[in-house]
């Protein structure tokens, strides 16, 4: 049996690595953790690795990419035997790198124990998954476990928030820090400067000891500039030179890639954007990003997930009312909880915000099911309006009381737009 104090899952991870011959040793490995931004950062990392002529395998929330073939993903980080088999297949099929999202659940449940990353990157931390970890301190401790000598050779840490700053201080690894908010008054090896918002994204400068790089990202929002900077600094930390990055990025026109369900622009008039934002922090950032480039009204369609951290429901309602002109509260994935109860939790925060000066002008409606809410928003929007459909992103299955229904927000937007064209 396992010795006391060792975890069976940890043992399984190590045995899996031995069975498959520690396949990750043949690859350059990048692990990305943090509350929001993991998926986008890993997609951007993979994109630039491809520009550099490498062949990255990808393990994450949206897809699994092995040997250049992508398939839909079931969970952020697979269980260790599956993971080792996936990595072994990558090596066999000629992949040169492994880029992986590492969730705090995966760290706590020892799924990635047998992998050691060349570079472990940290986006930021905010209250999410507290149903699993209990409080922010234990959530931080779970994330921090990735940044130990057994798990990684080098840390790249975004120091925009206090958690990143603390991780950089406490971490036992060689650390490269990056500050991406202009307002962050903290020492960092690399910083982002001169962000200019464009219709489709942002231009920005990454500047550090070794020089600077002016480039662009084709995803809206300053938080995506943060993700881009983290991806680029992770590559620099892995040994890619600034000159090489400059060469491939100027040839490609910057980080010119879309990420499924991450600030994904489905149409332009009205502009419909589908995003995975499913906590207050991400919702606030997404709304702020779209507000700055919307000449008409800003609409948001969203709900909260059932059987998850219930404290964030009212807060999401409040953020929506303060950030948008038109709010439609609908269903997300209710799971086995009564959808009306979840909507009421969100609505309570929305109504409270409407009672304040800042939220007084916002229109709030409750419309279910979700497809009807999306249709209502699209029918109502003017040509210069923006509609953010938040919470589900790339997901194509909605779980209601144990039944999986097909539902793709992007598809519902297209259907609603076609109906709108027909009635104009």
Model-identified regions with their sequence ranges:
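Acidic, Mg2+-coordinating active-site environments of NTP-dependent enzymes
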Residues: 93, 99-100, 108, 117-271, ...
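Phosphate-binding loop of NTP-binding sites
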Residues: 4, 9-159, 163-171
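ATP-dependent carboxylate-amine ligase
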Residues: 10, 28, 43, 50, ...
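N-terminal leader/targeting and accessory segments in enzymes
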Residues: 1-14, 18, 162, 220, ...
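Generic detector of well-ordered alpha-helical packing
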Residues: 80, 102, 125, 132, ...
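Cofactor-binding loop segments of dinucleotide-utilizing enzymes, especially the Rossmann-like FAD-
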Residues: 35, 61, 158-159, 180, ...
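Short acidic, glycine/proline-rich loop/turn micro-motifs
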Residues: 68-72, 217, 399-402
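Short acidic loop-to-helix transition motifs that present clustered carboxylates
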Residues: 104-107, 185, 369-373
């Amino acid at each position: 049996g396992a010795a006391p104090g060792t975890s069976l899952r940890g043992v399984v991870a190590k045995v899996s690595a031995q069975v498959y011959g520690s396949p990750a040793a043949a690859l350059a490995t990048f692990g990305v953790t943090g509350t929001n931004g993991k998926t986008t950062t890993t997609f951007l990392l993979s994109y630039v690795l491809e520009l550099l002529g490498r062949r990255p395998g990808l393990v994450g929330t949206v897809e699994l990419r092995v040997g250049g073939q992508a398939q839909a993903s079931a969970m952020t980080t697979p269980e260790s035997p599956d993971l080792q088999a996936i990595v072994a297949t990558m090596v066999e099929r000629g992949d040169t790198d492994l880029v992986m999202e590492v969730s705090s659940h995966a760290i706590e449940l020892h799924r990635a124990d047998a992998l050691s990353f060349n570079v472990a990157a940290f986006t930021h931390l905010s209250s999410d998954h507290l149903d699993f970890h209990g409080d922010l301190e234990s959530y931080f401790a779970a994330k921090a476990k990735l940044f130990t000598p057994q798990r990684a050779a080098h840390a790249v840490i975004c120091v925009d928030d206090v958690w990143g700053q603390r991780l950089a201080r406490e971490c036992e690894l060689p650390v490269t820090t990056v500050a991406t908010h202009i307002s962050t008054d903290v020492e960092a090896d690399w910083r982002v400067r001169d962000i200019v918002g464009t219709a489709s994204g942002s231009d920005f400068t990454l500047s550090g000891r070794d020089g600077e790089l002016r480039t662009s990202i084709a995803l809206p929002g300053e938080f995506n500039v943060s993700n881009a900077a983290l991806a680029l600094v992770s590559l620099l930390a892995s040994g890619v030179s600034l000159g090489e990055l400059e060469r491939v990025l100027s040839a490609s026109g910057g980080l010119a890639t879309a990420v499924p369900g991450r600030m994904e622009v489905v149409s332009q008039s009205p502009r419909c954007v589908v995003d995975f934002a499913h906590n207050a922090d991400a919702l606030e950032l997404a709304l702020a990003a779209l507000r700055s480039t919307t000449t008409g009204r800003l609409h948001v369609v969203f709900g909260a997930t059932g059987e998850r951290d219930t404290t964030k429901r009212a807060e999401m309602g409040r953020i929506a009312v303060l950030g948008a002109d038109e709010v439609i509260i609908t269903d997300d994935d209710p799971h086995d909880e009564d959808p009306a109860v979840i909507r009421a939790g969100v609505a309570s925060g929305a109504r409270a915000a409407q009672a304040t000066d800042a939220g007084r002008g916002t229109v709030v409606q409750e419309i279910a099911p979700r497809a009807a809410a999306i249709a209502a928003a699209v029918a109502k929007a003017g040509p210069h309006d923006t509609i953010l459909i938040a919470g589900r992103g790339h997901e194509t299955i909605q779980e209601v009381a144990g039944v999986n229904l097909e539902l793709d927000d992007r598809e519902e937007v297209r259907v609603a737009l076609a109906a709108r064209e027909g009635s104009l």
